[in-house]
């Protein structure tokens, strides 16, 4: 638990903090993709203006177990003044999850208010952080940010934020 503010910039502070359950969880990518979010640097940002936190993990067993541990810490009052909004599970591979991992996600889901699953997005493997579009709640509903406004056709990758990231971002912002 941080006893000093994590946010040291003079810019507007983030509304939501992303706490990585482990290295490589995806916090940097998600913080870049969601305008109101920032990485907490592996600590509970209890001294910051906005204490809202989303735990981020990959969908492999070690990631899910660590996210569950952190969720239980928060639930047990060990996260200072932070308010846990939920857990974002980022797919670690394409395809369907094995049954044991699905069950672990269900256990985590029962322990938190919200759980957002981010599927495997191949486009993220080839994009630099600078190329990632940003979902911003000020730009309107996620539905309008992920489809062409006239034709309702899908927009080419990387010209708009991926629909899965947009809808998860919107869900987190509304939580």
What are these regions (language model features)?
Residues 51-67, 92-98:
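Conserved Switch II/interswitch segment of TRAFAC-class P-loop GTPases
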Residues 15-36:
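Glycine-rich phosphate-binding P-loop
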Residues 107-137:
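Beta-strand-loop-alpha "switch" segments that mediate conformational coupling across diverse proteins
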Residues 1-16, 173-174:
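Extreme N-terminal, non-catalytic leader segments
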Residues 68-112:
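Conserved C-terminal guanine-recognition region of P-loop GTPase G domains, centered on the G4
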Residues 42-59, 71-87:
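Inter-motif core of Ras-like GTPase G domains
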Residues 130-159:
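C-terminal boundary of histidine-terminating zinc-finger modules
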Residues 3-6, 33-49:
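A short, well-structured beta->alpha microelement
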């Amino acid at each position: 638990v941080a006893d000093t503010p994590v946010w040291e910039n003079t810019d507007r502070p983030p509304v939501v903090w992303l706490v990585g359950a482990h290295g490589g969880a995806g916090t940097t990518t998600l913080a870049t993709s969601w305008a109101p979010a920032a990485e907490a640097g592996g600590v509970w940002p209890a001294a910051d203006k906005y204490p809202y936190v989303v735990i981020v993990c990959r969908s492999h067993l070690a990631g899910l177990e660590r996210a569950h541990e952190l969720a239980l810490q928060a639930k047990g009052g060990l996260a200072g003044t932070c308010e846990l909004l939920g857990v974002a599970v980022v797919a670690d591979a394409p395809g369907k999850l094995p049954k044991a991992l699905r069950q672990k996600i269900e256990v985590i889901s029962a322990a938190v208010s919200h759980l957002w699953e981010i599927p495997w997005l191949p486009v993220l493997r080839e994009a630099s952080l600078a190329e990632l579009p940003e979902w911003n709640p000020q730009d309107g509903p996620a539905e309008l940010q992920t489809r062409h406004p006239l034709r309702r056709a899908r927009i080419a990758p990387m010209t708009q934020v991926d629909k899965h990231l947009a809808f998860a971002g919107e869900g987190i912002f509304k939580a």
